[in-house]
């Protein structure tokens, strides 16, 4: 059966619309329902010199593969005119509305997955809308106590214990309870969505040298090791905590299904240096499939035709792949 994939185009002044239009230049085996302003997409397509025909979305219609040069559109109204590369806080509610719609329709099973384009967190918050990121937004909307942010690139998958919080708050956020929640989600989702029979999870320490036996911090001794031992007793394959500065080596990576980093900038710089533009952000623990690009808004490239659609293409392919594994 053909899958129906929601796509949010993201910040309207960014490269998000450009990338969605670029994706439309090829045929896809799923129906692509873009949550965006139709006039914005048509104007951006004209600016880029790319053909685009928009097909109105009707939920009662059976999903059909997307023909090249077309997108199915779920229309949303902008509050202000869009200028490429220029943020306008008046359009922040528009951005969040597209996310709300995509999340709701996935939870009701009207859609089979959502792929999200880049948003600008700063301008959304400047508009008075509390927003720390897609991952956190969808988790709250779906009433999930915890979700896991995982980025996947060829040969490496990195999941995060904490996401978009200040570094000063990270140590307090790493508790036995949270380690249990995050690792259980990771273990379960790697089995159910990725088909891994017994996933092997390698865990980074929090402190330099994984605490050096308590001489450079006690979080490993007091919190992490007891929690990991409890989880091992439940049959989960865990290695660590290991020093993060030496963990990302071939001798470890060849055996690891995923690396669990303790904070955002511990694991993602390594992954992005190896596979930037080819990696996919996947949210685990939601009641539906969500993938995303691995980059930001790149405002300076909006409307220029220079934006690289590689990550968006990977994210869409991964969403279709994962959705195809789910029973209809």
From Swiss-Prot:
Reactions it catalyzes: 4-(phosphooxy)-L-threonine + NAD(+) = 3-amino-2-oxopropyl phosphate + CO2 + NADH
The protein's enzyme class: oxidoreductase
Superkingdom of this protein's organism: Bacteria
Matching SUPFAM superfamilies: Isocitrate/Isopropylmalate dehydrogenase-like
Amino acids binding substrate: 134-135, 272, 281, 290
Cofactors: Zn(2+); Mg(2+); Co(2+)
Gene Ontology MF annotations: 4-hydroxythreonine-4-phosphate dehydrogenase activity; cobalt ion binding; magnesium ion binding; NAD binding; zinc ion binding
Cofactor note: Binds 1 divalent metal cation per subunit. Can use ions such as Zn(2+), Mg(2+) or Co(2+).
Keywords of the record: Cobalt, Cytoplasm, Magnesium, Metal-binding, NAD, NADP, Oxidoreductase, Pyridoxine biosynthesis, Zinc
A cellular component annotation (GO) from this entry: cytoplasm
Intracellular or extracellular location(s): Cytoplasm
Single biological process term from Gene Ontology: pyridoxine biosynthetic process
Residues holding a divalent metal cation: 164, 209, 264
Transmembrane segments: none
Metabolic or biological pathway, per its Swiss-Prot or TrEMBL entry: Cofactor biosynthesis; pyridoxine 5'-phosphate biosynthesis; pyridoxine 5'-phosphate from D-erythrose 4-phosphate: step 4/5
Note: The active site is located at the dimer interface.
Protein name: 4-hydroxythreonine-4-phosphate dehydrogenase
Gene name of the record: pdxA
């Amino acid at each position: 059966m053909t899958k129906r994939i929601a796509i949010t185009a993201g910040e309207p002044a960014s490269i998000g619309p450009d990338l969605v239009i670029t994706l439309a230049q090829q045929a896809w085996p799923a129906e692509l329902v873009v949550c965006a302003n139709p006039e914005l997409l048509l104007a951006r397509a004209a600016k880029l010199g790319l053909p685009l025909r928009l097909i109105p979305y009707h939920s009662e219609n059976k999903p059909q593969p997307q023909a090249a040069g077309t997108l199915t559109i779920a229309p949303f109204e902008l509050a202000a005119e869009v200028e490429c590369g220029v943020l306008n806080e008046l359009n922040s509610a528009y951005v969040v509305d597209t996310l709300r719609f995509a999340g709701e329709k996935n939870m009701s099973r009207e859609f089979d997955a959502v792929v999200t384009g880049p948003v600008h967190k700063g301008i959304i918050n400047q508009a008075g809308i509390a927003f720390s990121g897609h991952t956190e937004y969808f988790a709250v909307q779906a009433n999930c106590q915890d979700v896991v942010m995982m980025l996947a690139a060829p040969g490496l998958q990195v999941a995060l214990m904490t996401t978009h919080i200040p570094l000063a708050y990270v140590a307090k956020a790493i508790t036995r309870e949270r380690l249990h929640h995050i690792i259980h989600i990771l273990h379960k989702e790697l089995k159910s969505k990725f088909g891994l029979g017994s996933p092997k999870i390698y865990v980074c320490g929090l402190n330099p040298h994984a605490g050096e036996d308590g001489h450079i911090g006690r979080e490993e001794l007091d919190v992490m090791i007891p929690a990991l031992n409890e989880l091992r007793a439940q049959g989960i394959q865990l290695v660590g905590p290991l020093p993060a500065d030496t963990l990302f080596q071939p001798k470890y990576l060849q055996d690891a299904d995923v690396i669990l980093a303790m904070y955002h900038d511990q694991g993602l710089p390594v992954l992005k240096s190896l596979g930037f533009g080819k990696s996919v952000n996947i949210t685990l623990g939601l009641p539906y499939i969500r993938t995303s690009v691995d980059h930001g808004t790149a405002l300076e490239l909006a409307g220029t035709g220079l934006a690289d659609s590689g990550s968006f293409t990977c994210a869409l392919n991964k969403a279709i792949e994962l959705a195809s594994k789910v029973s209809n």
